[in-house]
Amino acid sequence: MRQRLANGLPVASLLPVSTSLVECSLEERLEACRRLAVESLASPRRFWLREAGLLDWVRPPDEAFVGEMKQGDVSWFSGGLLNAAWNAVDRHAVASPERTALVWARPEGDVVSWSFRELRQASSRMAQVLLSQGVRWGDRVVGHLPETPTLAMLHLGCARIGAVPVAVPVRSGGTLGRVLRATRARVLVTADEAPLSEGRLPLWERVEDLLGGLGRVESVLVERRTGAPVSLVYGRDQELGTALVRARPTCALRPCDGEDPLLLVPGLEDGPPVVHGLAGFLLCAALGLREAAGIGPGAQVLCTEGFSGPRIDVLWGTWVLGGALVFDERGDGAHRPRALGVTHLFGPRGALAAAGPGVLGASLDGSDASVAPVWTPEGGGMLSARFGDLGGTSLFGVDPVLVDVMGRRAAGAGSEGELCVKRSWPAQPRSLEQDHAGYVAQRLERFPGLYRTGLRCRQLADGALATTGLTPLGGVAPSNVFPIEGPIGRA
């Protein structure tokens, strides 16, 4: 029987993850993914309730899926209770407290490593600070931060207490005001500047210019990243570092429903953030990374796109599996993967090519281990994956179809069209923040019975899908400022 904390959360209840998959051949990965994909469509209830065991639950779900897709009435693992911070960090801090959880590559040139124990303590401090600012379950907390451990602490600190973090990429400054208005957030976490390879971005100046017209923001926590001058407003602003030092390094975990929201910033889209279901997002992100990319304990993952947009699925999925993340604040990690201990590199082809021979087609030890996924534009993991020249497969629960502008199905090698999905899957976006009618109109109404992904794809001779572009959803560009398709290389 599992031990449990006072609040019902399990202690040291880690289920084994497929660490051997890290060394699997591409053929073995492709075979496993195809087998699981077929099973997920043939017996979805049995498949998803079994795979839900990858997560620790306070109360396991009784059903996998309830609802119908026509009006976006979609619910996965509802009634089940869990906590994302426990699944991502705390359970690893119990089982392997000194294992590396985070590697921070700083622009100053040094590299700092954090263990799961240290990350649990740091995220608990962040949670205590947020509680002191009046943040409670369901509250949205907006972050506008560089790729530092503070960004990780924000994601995890919110998750501990059931709040909803919304991270706005520092290169998407024009998005910040829109996100603050859409989420009605009262708390903003930012930094004085973001030191990037092309120079320093003045984040605080951007925030100051914006907050004058946003009276709803009551508290601004400011990280002193570079020491640039910051004029704090008494009663509203405070230095985050000082608050963290004063906070306790422990904080109770709040159980959350499987359908509690997880929000993603929609990149180029002019609309509100995209809403996901918490459990389905975590499970699909982790399952895809485990089976397609072979990530598990000991993996060290670098994502060149960062963790403030749709690829926070890489963040949550890697940590659920017990791997470590490289926060590449310098932005040159693809050029020095060995120095950072990178085992898995996520990014566009150009970044992977910069990593040196072997990353695109083979690893640095000479073995071929490249995977080319088609990512969902709005987070939640991979829709399908190609494994070198061996072929590809749709991934778990995804029943894809290509359609033309009239909704006619396209099939066969060389066919091209908009990628839609014929049934709900756990990582399907649930809504748009404060605009469910817009979600239904953009993604569900044009082709009844299908979910529009916003991707244009071509079917290859081996049956795999390759992304060819984007399709506007209801006249609005799909929500992904990052490259949709890109290989995963074993560095």
Where are these regions (language model features)?
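AMP-dependent adenylate-forming
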Residues: 21-25, 65-66, 88-115, 227-231, ...
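Conserved AMP-binding/adenylate-forming core of the ANL superfamily
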Residues: 85, 102-155, 172-177, 236-245, ...
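Conserved pre-ATP/AMP-binding loop-to-beta segment of ANL
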Residues: 98-100, 221-222, 227-271, 276-286, ...
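A short helix-loop-beta submotif of the ANL/AMP-binding
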Residues: 127, 140, 146-170, 183-187, ...
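Structural core segment of the AMP-binding/adenylate-forming
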Residues: 156, 160-241, 332-355, 487-490
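Conserved AMP-binding/adenylation subdomain of ANL enzymes
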Residues: 164, 280-300, 307-344, 385-388
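Gly/Ser/Thr-rich phosphate-binding loop
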Residues: 232-234, 238-244, 320-323, 337-390, ...
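Conserved ATP-binding/catalytic segment of the ANL
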Residues: 420-489
